[in-house]
Amino acid sequence: MDSKEMVVEEIMRIHRSLPLRPEIDDVETATSLIQNVEKEDRNRLEAIDKLVKTSSSEVPLELFNVFKEMKKSLVRFQSTEQTREATKILDLESVHVVFDELIQRASFCIASPNSTTALPRSVPVPAPVVSSDEIPFKSKEIISRDDTFVKKAKSSFYSDGLLAPSKPQVLDSTLHQAKNVAGNDGEKLSLIKLASLIEVSAKKATQELNLQHRLMDQLEWLPDSLGKLSSLVRLDLSENCIMVLPATIGGLISLTRLDLHSNRIGQLPESIGDLLNLVNLNLSGNQLSSLPSSFNRLIHLEELDLSSNSLSILPESIGSLVSLKKLDVETNNIEEIPHSISGCSSMEELRADYNRLKALPEAVGKLSTLEILTVRYNNIRQLPTTMSSMANLKELDVSFNELESVPESLCYAKTLVKLNIGNNFANLRSLPGLIGNLEKLEELDMSNNQIRFLPYSFKTLSNLRVLQTEQNPLEELPRDITEKGAQAVVQYMNDLVEARNTKSQRTKPKKSWVNSICFFCKSSTN
């Protein structure tokens, strides 16, 4: 390098060889993400340290310690993987900071009357970013190296081609893929890309974010920055591997729909109760064993799906959800529905199939707005006697239980259209005598029971179109009649009742003329 021009050209070539500089927002996102990961790691490591071998355990202490150390090592490895992209961004930014200062030093040398003058200061070699506590730059000092990405002043460059020591304004993002990744089909988001997307969405006041099946499998928790999405109205995080929700989720104050189904969430933060505008919440297919006490604050919630979890009880606070219309708790381990359920005065649909219910509380019968009640595959022996108050009930399914009888009060729920009492096997032996009151009944499944007779009122079920009677020891109903359909059975019962009435009238004892004469004789003697 014999000439100044050759040295300048080589300096600029080296400068141009760097990858594009991260945008300020991306650097701040990476910094925040690393801080979040470190915080989460501390919590996880503390939880591992608190693991204690029980005295009754047969596991040797040394083996137990090996187990704990392996869990810690896994946490550290996962931390490294999660912060890899963020660390790369900060390392790249660190190099750009150093190069910018070196360019300024070179410019100072060229601008100086005596180019051999000592340089104003030395610049240390940049070290890789390891911890969020040691960020080697300030975001306000970031300078772009490429004039196609900056707004230049008229004197941005010297005549020799070196960058002047002014600070151009960054206009474009160098991580545009992270910004638009939500729209790229097939690509899953890493932690840094998710964090970047959250930052951009927060600045744009995004109202809807769909990340269904879009997060990498290794991503088990969400960054605290999620709470910045205060304008978000709909959020879909379903079908991922999320295990923990950040406490900052309570900051989503505009949220009306939250879909978290098919994740691995074991516990909800208390801050979930701060989502006061929430209308629809889907938590199905997770690992929840309880609900937070703050749940009672979700007074605008209309649809709640808790199916396919590990719930053993529903809290009494469920009765505070006065706007709740649909509640799905199918496929849990629930043994009892709380009496406070009567407080859900807007309830239209209650699904509690595949649980361990032994009975339904009388309070269920007071849900006058309820239209659908399905409790299949439980251990229910009896239904509430208050069911006559269910003025809007249209569908009732109590199949595959241990039902011993159907209360007469149900026959006053005259809006009933579908009734399934099938597969109660040896326990159910009769139908209520007033079943004919159910004038709107269209479908009746009474199969696989021990019912021997149909009530005479059956003849008034004029709207019945589907009837399942298989595997019952019916004594008065020929099989060929049942094979003809529901209305054939109704007509048969009508004919049977009329025939019996006619027969009973014919067999009534009539007064003979001898009895009449004796009667008059007795009257005259008196």
Curated annotation (Swiss-Prot):
Transmembrane segments: none annotated. GO terms for cellular component: plasma membrane. Leucine-rich repeat protein that likely mediates protein interactions, possibly in the context of signal transduction. This is Plant intracellular Ras-group-related LRR protein 5. LRR repeats lie at residues 229-252, 253-275, 276-297, 298-321, 323-344, 346-367, 368-390, 391-414, 416-437, 438-463, 465-484. Belongs to the SHOC2 family. Widely expressed but preferentially in roots. The keyword Glycoprotein does not apply. A motif (GVYW) lies at residues 485-492. It comes from the Eukaryota. It comes from Arabidopsis thaliana. Keywords: Leucine-rich repeat, Repeat. InterPro entries: Leu-rich_rpt (IPR001611), Leu-rich_rpt_typical-subtyp (IPR003591), LRR_dom_sf (IPR032675), LRR_domain-containing (IPR050216), LRR_R13L4/SHOC2-like (IPR055414). PROSITE patterns: LRR. The keyword Repeat applies.
